[in-house]
């Protein structure tokens, strides 16, 4: 099968600079990387083709040979001898890691494989507002992978140990060559571990870990809110064959409260008052998380008026300064009136009639005046 021109593969001209070649490689490597194209069987081959073109065209000596002899310079028996450029090329993952850093979690470095760290775990915890504000302790049960006790997490039967894999010599990877392609992959003998367990533990069957449900006591600091996350270091799944354990992340969700709404460190609540208290003034009891307090209601208070009670909110988990309680007064209209009460209200209403009526109901008069002007403008 004929091979594509390397310049065509990268989409650059034959006089392209090394910078242009590297830029094209980054774009195409991200486009065709197998991790981003799972299920696309053509992606790995396209990625390898891009990588080979990059390796050749960024090496001055190899590029000169390619410009003069084309693909023949790197074929068996061609320029450069058997094996072509294979002896001088780097790891498939190394070059990708050098160019992209940790975009895909870091390059696949060569060298001895280490046992993998345990996975992190997540637990969703629901709290009442009072628990979140004051702090509390909760016992939780977590299904996890724990280190096997009989073998101390090694995977080998007690009194025995693992041996270095003879296929990869402990590297965990082997290099496969296809023509001028050289690709590293997990060792098929040890499955990338670098070690072989000849006499596995009967409890964990060589894995070094067993399924277990463990109980933890979680201390919730005061002031947490929905979306906060508490990290418990080392309480995730056990690592492979003695590697460090992962972490446990407790995700906090605060349930809705029947009185208070929370916004940051401030609390909000609505308090109903009678229309007589709103008109004449007085005192009303207001609930707080620390008990009841009195709020003075000024004369002629309108419904919806808000009052700020400083320091009666939530003490923040990070700031340690308390927010405020914002109280919204709602003026209630009396219901189920007696005949006498209706008569009194009628007399009260009639007392507003006359030339002074406007001053008693400034909002109503302002609204009616606005409506009149609106319709007057429509008829002009």
UniProtKB/Swiss-Prot annotation:
Top-level taxon in the UniProt lineage: Bacteria
Protein name: Chaperone protein DnaJ
Entry-linked Pfam families: DnaJ, DnaJ_C, DnaJ_CXXCXGXG
Entries under InterPro entries matching the protein: DnaJ (IPR012724), DnaJ_C (IPR002939), DnaJ_domain (IPR001623), DnaJ_domain_CS (IPR018253), HSP40/DnaJ_pept-bd (IPR008971), HSP_DnaJ_Cys-rich_dom (IPR001305), HSP_DnaJ_Cys-rich_dom_sf (IPR036410), J_dom_sf (IPR036869)
CDD domains recorded: DnaJ (cd06257), DnaJ_C (cd10747), DnaJ_zf (cd10719)
GO-annotated biological processes: chaperone cofactor-dependent protein refolding; DNA replication; protein refolding; response to heat
Ranges: CXXCXGXG motif repeats: 148-155, 165-172, 187-194, 201-208
Organism name: Aliivibrio salmonicida (strain LFI1238) (Vibrio salmonicida (strain LFI1238))
Domain notes: The J domain is necessary and sufficient to stimulate DnaK ATPase activity. Zinc center 1 plays an important role in the autonomous, DnaK-independent chaperone activity of DnaJ. Zinc center 2 is essential for interaction with DnaK and for DnaJ activity.
Record-listed Zn(2+) 1 binding positions: 148, 151, 201, 204
Family: Belongs to the DnaJ family.
Keyword line: Chaperone, Cytoplasm, DNA replication, Metal-binding, Repeat, Stress response, Zinc, Zinc-finger
């Amino acid at each position: 099968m004929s091979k594509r021109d390397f310049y065509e593969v990268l989409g650059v001209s034959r006089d392209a600079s090394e910078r242009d070649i590297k830029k094209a490689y980054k774009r195409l490597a991200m486009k065709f990387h197998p991790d981003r194209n799972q299920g696309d069987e053509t992606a790995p081959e396209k990625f390898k083709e891009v990588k080979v073109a990059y390796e050749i065209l960024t090496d001055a000596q190899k590029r000169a040979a390619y410009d003069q002899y084309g693909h023949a310079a790197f074929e068996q028996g061609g320029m450069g001898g058997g094996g072509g450029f294979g002896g001088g090329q780097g790891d498939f993952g190394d070059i990708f890691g050098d160019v992209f850093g940790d975009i895909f979690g870091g390059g696949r470095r060569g060298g001895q494989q280490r046992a993998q760290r345990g996975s992190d775990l997540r637990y969703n915890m629901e709290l009442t507002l009072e628990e979140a504000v004051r702090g509390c302790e909760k016992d939780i049960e977590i299904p996890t992978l724990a280190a096997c006790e009989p073998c101390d997490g090694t995977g080998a039967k007690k009194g025995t140990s693992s041996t270095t894999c003879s296929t990869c010599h402990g590297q965990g990877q082997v290099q496969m060559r296809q023509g001028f392609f050289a690709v590293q992959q997990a060792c098929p003998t040890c499955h990338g571990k670098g070690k072989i367990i000849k006499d596995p533990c009967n409890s964990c069957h060589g894995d070094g870990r067993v399924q277990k449900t463990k109980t933890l006591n979680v201390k919730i600091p005061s002031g947490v809110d929905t979306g906060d996350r508490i990290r418990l270091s080392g309480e995730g799944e056990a690592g492979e064959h003695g590697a460090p354990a992962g972490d446990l992340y407790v995700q906090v969700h605060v349930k809705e409260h029947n009185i208070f709404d929370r916004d940051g460190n401030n609390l909000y609540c609505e308090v109903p008052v009678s229309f007589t208290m709103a008109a004449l003034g007085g005192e009303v009891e207001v609930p707080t998380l620390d008990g009841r307090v009195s709020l003075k209601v000024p004369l002629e208070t309108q419904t919806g008026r808000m009052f700020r009670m400083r320091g009666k909110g939530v003490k923040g988990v990070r700031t340690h300064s308390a927010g405020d309680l914002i109280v919204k007064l709602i003026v209630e209209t009396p219901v189920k009136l007696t005949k006498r009460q209706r008569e009194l209200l009628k007399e009260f209403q009639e007392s507003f009639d006359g030339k002074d009526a406007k001053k008693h109901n400034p909002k109503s008069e302002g609204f009616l005046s606005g409506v009149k002007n609106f319709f007057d403008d429509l008829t002009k």
